[in-house]
Amino acid sequence: MYKRLKILPIVILLVSCKRTDTFPYYPVFLEFNITAIAPELKASGGYKEFTAPLNYSQRVGLGGILVFHSIEDKFFAFDMACPNEQRANIKLHCNNMGIAVCDSCGSQFLVSDGLGFVLKGQAKIPLQKYNVYYSAYLDNLVVRN
């Protein structure tokens, strides 16, 4: 009887303690004209890192916003904070291959496919993805969550 009473609290602790692997919510709203603000996004494979809002009404998430132009002529946007680190001062950096790399933990993420999955490293969850709306007529891009 006493042995069961000793085991019960341990079992309860093991079952109730559950780590959540989610990215914290931060507001995101970024709107800009590609020709004026980010001409590097005109070409497929181009990317732009926004680490600060362009004006007072815009928000760039936790670590900033990475916008990538895929070879399928689609735009994808991700938070630049590494999901493993989840700190604003540790940012991912993209390369022309469509891979974002965290300098702190070494995790690598594939952004060119629009999913942000982990390629290698310590990270367990993909990048935080944001919705992208593109107006070809106005050449404007809107990123929001």
Role assignments for model-derived ranges:
Residues 18-95, 110-113, 128-145:
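N-terminal pre-ligand scaffold of iron-sulfur
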Residues 1-17:
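Sec-dependent bacterial lipoprotein signal peptides
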